A protein has these predicted regions:
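Alpha-helical segment of the N-proximal tetratricopeptide repeat
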Residues: 42-73
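Canonical tetratricopeptide repeat
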Residues: 83, 117, 151-154
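Structural marker of alpha-solenoid helical repeat scaffolds
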Residues: 73, 107, 140-141
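Canonical positions in the second alpha-helix
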Residues: 69-70, 103-104, 137-138
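Helix-start (N-cap) detector for alpha-helical repeat units in TPR-like alpha-solenoids
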Residues: 44, 78-79, 112-113, 145-146
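Terminal, low-structured helical/coil segments at or just beyond the last alpha-helical repeat
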Residues: 11, 15, 34-45, 132-162
């Protein structure tokens, strides 16, 4: 059997140490994708910032693309799912919008933005009862919040399409 030269740096103890350290050093990165984020952390995410600017410019396609990238990298980011839903709602992609809102609410059932925006979406598709259900959840969380009053006003002004 042929013999191969052994690199002196790859001794058994060093190799064992490397096999232990590599997964340990990679752990914070792997865990980061599974952790929820805060507004401050979101502001540091390039695609999140691009998405927010796109929303301000009413560039819904760019916003949806940007927030899709955020949730691909951090599937626990309820804020990004909410804004992905918001962007898709403005694009008229209601199924995609509701899927994103539902994901945001699965991650954070008290997400006021997702409750409000999904309620607005339900009005857009003529499902007033579902919008009222979202309003009831908002009222239980924060009766005087802007999200609650905005959705209540939209429901009060709602007229079904003819």
């Amino acid at each position: 059997m042929p013999s191969f030269p052994v690199c002196p740096l790859m001794s058994a103890p060093l190799l064992s140490l490397a096999l232990v350290l590599v997964p340990v050093l990679a752990l914070p990165t792997a865990q980061a994708a599974d952790m929820p984020t805060t507004p401050v952390e979101n502001a540091r995410i390039d695609d999140f910032a691009v998405g927010k600017k796109a929303i301000e410019a009413k560039n819904w396609a760019l916003a949806a693309s940007s927030f899709s990238k955020v949730v691909a990298k951090n599937p626990q980011n309820a804020d990004a799912y909410n804004l992905l839903g918001y962007s898709n709602r403005w694009l008229g992609k209601y199924d995609e919008a509701f899927a994103a809102y539902n994901k945001a609410l699965a991650l954070d059932p008290r997400h006021k933005g997702a409750l409000e925006y999904s309620g607005m979406g339900y009005l857009k598709v003529g499902q007033k009862a579902q919008a009222e259900a979202q309003l009831a959840k908002l009222q239980a969380i924060c009766a005087q919040c802007e999200e609650t009053t905005d959705l209540a006003k939209a429901i009060a002004a709602y007229k079904p399409a003819r």
